[in-house]
A protein has these predicted regions:
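Active-site mouth of glycoside hydrolases
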Residues: 28-250, 254-263
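A short, sequence-level motif marking secondary-structure junctions
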Residues: 55-59, 419-420, 443-445
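Active-site clefts of carbohydrate-active enzymes
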Residues: 244-257, 264-305
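Short beta-strand segments
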Residues: 186-188, 217-220, 240, 281-284, ...
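Bacterial N-terminal signal peptides that target proteins for export
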Residues: 1-9
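Aromatic- and carboxylate-lined catalytic core of secreted/periplasmic carbohydrate-active enzymes
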Residues: 49, 269, 276-280, 287-291, ...
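C-terminal motif of bacterial Sec signal peptides marking the signal peptidase cleavage site
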Residues: 19-20
């Protein structure tokens, strides 16, 4: 072998060795894409690990916060255990962000207003879409997924988006973000799927055709669910519910048919029975701090106890996660705002510390603390007559455990023997603090009665946990 050839081969083997030792390439965010679990009930990461969706509603993040403010908000949500941020790409048409950059040319969403370069210090380079790029990447660095709403329902309903424009716009979005692993597409936007149906179908179909690896869902109007229109559509990976913001006695509109009131678990239970099997989630229950019923600011406001109730009710009924929202945060209420919606009287910088925001992580941590993909809702566990509304007990179980949630702290009885073993370990889990207190072992036969800590009242909520010994 001549000396020259030896040097070439040595260099080649050296290069191959280095490449072999290098870690597998990841996306710029270092995050794994999400996919459905094998049983189609839950989400998981690409390597098969459970993913419990704990969302926060940051609808106007893109067009109301600058780069520094976005970092403050996203970092706070990361620290509080959230892993999904729900964001509108286009809230209105036309649309511009805090830097004054327009999203589109004129009012045509099929013509995104883009410029060469993306230097943030150069206003001629840093366009609307560069700002969204930054938000997506920043979220990814913090381990957060972005559930992006391409265009909100109101401008579509008003006729500002044609089916052809929707198709072109969706293709632009799909091709721009299909290599970002921390994206979830949230078609729709507080609207019935039957309203402008062709627009929503074109968006869903085009996203799927050009971006086959990201999950797609549909955000419906209040007191409805995506399954009413799109359950059988190939582009819809999982269902989404907006249980809404009304009290029981406020849910009387003749335009609605379900009238579940505050019983958001009923939407989840209905989706759970559908075929083909698809995961489901309540992605917009009542927001903490918003007036009950939304529009009359003299009404009482929903509290942290209420958002806990919606969370545990829906998850124990079979949902794969839960989305929290706070009135001032969802609209990013700033001191510069000339007006606010729904009686928001607090700046977002303060409202991010609402009590419920810190409590939601306890739900996620609880569900991830036991076997995950085998969990099912099971109301046959509840042996005493099912009470209605706030007194209802929601129960769920896995292979080796049972959980039952009470919002009022009332006594209740469970049918034993649903998991293996002669005895079970019994504990009370506090949704306010995330603390678990073991209180004994009990026989795993017959019916057993349980008395939660404290007095019976709304908001004295507890989770009973029974584990196989």
């Amino acid at each position: 072998m001549n000396k020259h050839r030896f040097k070439l081969l040595s260099a080649l083997f050296f290069t191959i060795g280095i490449l072999a030792c290098q870690p597998e390439k990841k996306s710029p965010e270092g995050m794994q894409a999400l996919r459905l679990s094998e049983n189609k009930r839950y989400l998981m990461t690409a390597d098969g690990k459970p993913f419990f969706w704990l969302g926060d509603t940051g609808w106007l993040l893109l067009n109301k916060l600058d780069r520094n403010e976005a970092d403050q908000y996203l970092e706070d949500r990361r620290k509080k255990g959230f892993n999904v941020i729900q964001v509108m790409v286009l809230h209105t048409i036309p649309e511009k962000n805090i830097y004054g950059r327009r999203a589109m040319i004129g009012e045509d969403i099929s013509k995104p207003d883009t410029t060469k370069g993306n230097l943030s210090t150069d206003s001629l380079q840093y366009d609307y879409w560069d700002h969204l790029d930054y938000m997506v990447d920043l979220a990814g660095k913090k381990g957060l997924y972005m559930a992006l709403v391409p265009v909100w329902g109101s401008p579509v309903k008003s006729g500002k988006v044609s089916p052809d424009q929707a198709r072109s716009y969706a293709e632009f979005l799909a091709k721009r973000y299909r290599d970002k692993t921390n994206i979830i597409w949230m078609n729709g936007g507080d609207i019935k799927g039957s309203d402008s149906l062709k627009v929503w179908q074109n968006i869903g179909q085009t996203l799927r055709a050009n971006d086959p690896h990201h999950l797609i869902t549909f955000h419906p109007r209040g007191r409805s669910q995506s399954s009413l229109w799109f359950h059988a559509e190939p582009w819809l990976d999982f269902n989404m519910v907006q249980s809404g913001h009304q009290r029981y006695e406020q849910d009387t509109s003749r335009k609605e048919t379900l009238h579940y009131g505050e019983d958001n678990w009923k939407y989840i239970a209905a989706d759970y029975q559908l075929k083909p099997t698809k995961p489901t989630i309540d992605a917009e229950p009542s927001y903490e701090g918003i007036p009950q019923g939304l529009h009359d600011i003299r009404q009482p406001r929903w509290t942290d106890a209420d958002v806990r109730r919606y969370g545990y009710w829906s998850v124990f009924a079979g949902a794969f996660g839960y989305t929290y929202g706070q009135n001032s945060v969802m609209q990013m209420h700033r001191k510069e705002d000339k007006e606010t919606a729904y009686g928001s009287d607090e700046l977002w910088t303060s409202a991010i510390n609402a009590p419920g925001a810190s409590q939601m992580q306890h739900l996620k941590n609880l569900m991830l603390s036991r076997s995950y993909f085998d969990r099912v809702p099971d109301q046959t566990l509840v042996s005493d007559q099912q009470a209605e509304k706030y007194d209802r007990i929601l129960a769920t179980r896995g292979k080796d455990y049972i959980m039952a949630y009470t919002y009022t702290g009332r006594d209740f009885s469970l049918n034993m023997g649903k998991i293996p073993g002669g005895k079970v370990k019994a504990s009370w889990f506090d949704p306010r603090t995330g603390k678990t207190d073991f209180f004994g072992e009990i026989a795993n036969t017959g019916a057993a009665k349980f008395d939660p800590p404290g007095e019976r009242k709304n908001g004295n909520d507890w989770v009973l946990i029974l584990d196989k010994v």
